[in-house]
């Protein structure tokens, strides 16, 4: 029996609660392996017995049988379409509906945040915040999506009084790196940790006596080996991706935490500067 087809075609026959169940199953069929009737009931705000009755209404003995059948139907459908479906990003294909794409993207980002936060060594993080707070000058380096994360952090740090350079041009990044000195900090953002431009800048900064802080993945890399301190990020993106979406999410969680930690260190003055910035920008409207 094709339960997915039956669910799609029987909409007018469903009660309000049954329609909730049907919508859930259609939208999240790819995730059913990890979903129990208890979880479904809690999320939908209905009883478990309603889910069992729904399964029986469709001809299954219970939710477990319906769930396994739906998983089987979904897998068979994927096998048929995989030959023609184009992989757009990570696990997202051209056959996915916008609702499925939204769920996949959200879950990818949620996992990146959860796994990155689980790795935090808060004592080391506090030490890094202290080092940055004492920096005479801060350089932030990054390429592509990492450069966007760096630029966002640079704006935040400038807002609370830090002297920061964050240039997109790699030649300028290298030029700034060689001019750093002891007491300065370079924050290098690279998930792979192997981009030659970023590694070159880190080498130059370290040679000049600056402290190098790397925001990178757990993988062994040239940048990781060069850095005095590392802040680890985790991303579930596969090698095939159209953009560094969950990677950037993980990196932003780290840089936002650094910013708030720095605000907390000097809260009164930082909040005054943030307020002044807000007042000035309001005058531009």
Swiss-Prot record:
Transmembrane segments annotated in the record for this chain: none
SUPFAM superfamilies membership: Homeodomain-like, SIS domain
One GO MF term: DNA-binding transcription factor activity
Sorted UniProt keywords: Carbohydrate metabolism, DNA-binding, Repressor, Transcription, Transcription regulation
UniProt DNA-binding region: 37-56
Residues annotated as domain HTH rpiR-type: 1-77
Domain SIS: 128-268
Keyword Transferase (UniProt): no
PROSITE patterns for this protein: HTH_RPIR (PS51071), SIS (PS51464)
One Pfam family cited in the UniProt record for this chain: SIS
GO terms (BP aspect): carbohydrate derivative metabolic process; N-acetylmuramic acid catabolic process; negative regulation of DNA-templated transcription; regulation of carbohydrate catabolic process
Pathway assigned to this chain's UniProt record: Amino-sugar metabolism; N-acetylmuramate degradation [regulation]
Quaternary structure and partners: Homotetramer.
Known function: Represses the expression of the murPQ operon involved in the uptake and degradation of N-acetylmuramic acid (MurNAc). Binds to two adjacent inverted repeats within the operator region. MurNAc 6-phosphate, the substrate of MurQ, is the specific inducer that weakens binding of MurR to the operator.
UniProt protein name: HTH-type transcriptional regulator MurR
Species this protein is from: Escherichia coli (strain B / BL21-DE3)
Gene for this chain: murR
């Amino acid at each position: 029996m094709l339960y997915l087809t039956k669910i799609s075609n029987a909409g007018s026959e469903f009660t309000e609660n049954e329609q909730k169940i049907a919508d859930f199953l259609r939208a999240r069929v790819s995730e059913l392996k990890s979903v129990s009737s208890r979880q479904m009931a809690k999320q939908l705000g209905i009883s478990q017995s309603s889910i069992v009755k729904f399964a029986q209404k469709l001809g299954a003995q219970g939710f477990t049988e319906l769930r396994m059948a739906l998983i089987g139907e979904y897998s068979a459908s994927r096998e048929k379409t995989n030959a023609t479906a184009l992989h757009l990003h990570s696990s997202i294909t051209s056959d996915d509906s916008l609702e499925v794409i939204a769920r996949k993207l959200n879950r990818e980002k949620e996992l990146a945040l959860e796994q990155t936060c689980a790795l935090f060594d808060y004592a080391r993080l506090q030490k890094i915040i202290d080092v940055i707070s004492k920096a005479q000058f801060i350089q932030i380096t990054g390429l592509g999506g990492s450069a966007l994360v760096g630029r966002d952090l640079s704006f935040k740090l400038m807002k609370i009084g830090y002297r920061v350079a964050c240039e997109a041009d790699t030649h300028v990044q290298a030029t700034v790196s060689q001019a750093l000195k002891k007491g300065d900090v370079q924050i290098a953002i690279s998930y792979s940790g192997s981009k030659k431009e970023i590694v070159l800048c880190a080498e130059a900064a370290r040679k000049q006596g600056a402290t190098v802080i790397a925001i990178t993945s757990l993988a062994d890399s040239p940048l990781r080996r060069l850095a005095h301190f590392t802040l680890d990020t985790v991303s579930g993106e596969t090698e095939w991706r159209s953009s560094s979406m969950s990677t950037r999410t993980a990196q932003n969680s780290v840089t936002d935490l650094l910013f708030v930690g720095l605000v907390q260190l000097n809260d009164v003055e930082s909040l005054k500067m943030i307020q002044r910035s807000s007042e000035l920008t309001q005058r531009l409207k």
